[in-house]
Amino acid sequence: MVNFGKKLMADQVEEWKGYYINYKLMKKMLKQYVQQTQLGGKDREQVLKEFSRILDEQIERIVLFLLQQQGHLANRIEELGEQRAALLEQHDISQVFQLREAYREVGRDLIKLLRFVDMNATGIRKILKKFDKRFGYRFTDYYVTTRANHPYSQLQQVFKQVGIVAVVGALSRNLAYLQDHEGSVLSIYDHPSVTLKDPIIDQVNHAVQKLTHATSFLQFLGQHALIIQEDVQSGSEDLVDDQSYHFMSLILNLVNTFLYMVNTYIIVPTADDYAVSLGAAATVCGVIIGSMAVAQVFSSVYFSAWSNRSYFRPLVFSSIMLFAGNLLYALAYDLNSLTVLLIGRLLCGLGSARAVNRRYISDCVPLKIRLQASAGFVSASALGMACGPALAGLLQTRFKIYSLTFDQSTLPGWVMCIAWLVYLLWLWISFKEPGHFAKSSDTAQPAESGHQVNANLEEGLAQPLLTGSEEGQDQNAEDNDDNEEESKNSHGPATSISSAYKLLTPSVKVQLLIYFMLKYAMEILLSESSVITTYYFNWSTSAVAIFLAILGCTVLPVNAIVGSYITNLFEDRQILVASEIMVLIGIIMSFRYTPHYSVPQYVLSALITFVFAEVLEGVNLSLLSRVMSSRLARGTYNGGLLSTEAGTLARVVADATITAAGYLGPDLLLNITLLPPLVICIASLVATFCTYNTLY
């Protein structure tokens, strides 16, 4: 990947050259300050003040130029508006086309200005991170706190561009008035549902969204998948060839995601009854549910590595393992063996191909629909989470065929066996391997067919993200200076767990802790629900299934509200803190304080915990995708794998907690299992406040 120094020089507008952040100067100043502090020439307080002053001057120059350019664009739009008013009275169609092209020219200049701001905002972030890294001092915290919250903040002008958005609105409105719509003119304010079909406006909106992190429901939902985008310019060419994209293969990945989530949650309402029928305690349901997560800890790594070579074979292997695992799960009752049941669940966990599903979307889906695919991944997961318990509630019957028993405990296994067998056949017939895998397969096995496409994705991904002309000696010196900190290898993906861990900044670690906490709290709530509700309220399996299905059905509506409205009113970090506090309140409400534990208390506390954990997950992954290194966008040890491992470990620990607490008796189970998530939630809140300003 091209480093930022080269990228800045290659992409800057020549006539605006003197107004960009002087990235080279800032890096040299950092180097000098490091040497001076090591020699004892300056103390850190002096360095902090001097560097702050220099950065203030850089930002002031950027902001004043930005305001000047906004004024020029506003004047041009005003002049064109006067022409538009005159032309609409004359009804001269030819002049209308010329005027529309003039507006589009303003749009092109606006895109240049948006990229100017984006490049400078990126430069400021990188310089702040470099300072923290070089000095081991949280300069970002100090600088953001003192500058961003000041009433005369210039930093806000760079990161919160109200003026630019106003220019975008004026441009969109005027182009809409000129758009022919059944013989009348349009107003974007009177007809907000009408889409303005103009490529310039599409490009402008894309640039604004990239710059401001503006969020729609689709974007918010897509960020749940944590499919990290590499740091490319908004106008960059998509490296995934449209011809190499195969829609049915994407659908098969999403169906795999859906079925796996159904497979995970379909046993939750009946796991305690199954354990009792095999002679174990009801709380062994924690081990039964958690054994799948234990295996997933390991399967996520080897599936992620396997996806470097193929997507088809891992999905086939996944289907076979899940078929075999569910078969053993279903047969365990007639074999009267808890061991067989646990082996079956372990095999199901070893078939978890979610890392492959994420990787396929990241690497093999064109950029223009990758957001929709990511949202589809999350929607499939949410739908599976809701359908699993609901399906279990429908399987309340009992009959025998020969010596095989079919009841509420074994039917989930039999149903999923059939589902995975059908999926395997569909996969074998319809899946097409991406081009670079198919070509290598052709070389080794010419007879193999049915899994090919034409584009060479591997070569495309290997190309530099930005290219430019050869730079002069000064630029080479700057690049060499970059390489003192970041070797050529440092631009590639992480190649080991240790190298991935080194890329985790304090902000990323805190977000992973929050992710661990919310998954822990949700797993405790879901996995022990059948035991708790049976002990305190004498609920039937159907009642538990309905309750869990209702919880699962809240996922998409909650994300719709947060993604469409809440994130447009508040910053992500503000929603993060508020959600953590609400999860904490939900956990505190869940404790049994009196001998009588009521249904309203349990249901209300469960809803608060689950709903706000869902809100927290979306915002957490949104922030995580923003603060995580772009080096974790690809490769085996990618950001999606790290988040999956954190969440899976949380589930393992939570399920183990339920089983261990079960030995103390059902009366103490609820309060004992709620103590760890309470402590972790408080710790994550403290950690969030400590890194709050780095989430800017």
Swiss-Prot record:
Q: Specify where the region named Disordered lies, as residue ranges.
A: 470-494
User: Which CDD domains did the record assign?
Assistant: SPX-MFS_plant
Assign the protein's first listed, main location to one coarse class. membrane
Segments crossing the lipid bilayer: 247-267, 278-298, 315-335, 338-357, 375-395, 411-431, 512-532, 543-563, 575-595, 603-623, 669-689
Which residue ranges does the record assign to the SPX domain? Answer: 2-145
Q: Which organism is it from?
A: Oryza sativa subsp. indica
| Acidic residues: compositionally biased ranges | 471-485
List the protein's name.
SPX domain-containing membrane protein OsI_17046
GO molecular-function terms, A-Z:
transmembrane transporter activity
Q: Look up keyword Transmembrane and say if it applies.
A: yes
Membrane topology according to the record: Multi-pass membrane protein
Q: Which family does it belong to?
A: Belongs to the major facilitator superfamily.
Specify the signal sequence span. none
Q: Which UniProt keywords apply?
A: Membrane, Transmembrane, Transmembrane helix
GO CC terms in record? membrane
Pfam families of this UniProt entry?
A: MFS_1 (PF07690), SPX (PF03105)
Q: Where does this one sit in the cell?
A: Membrane
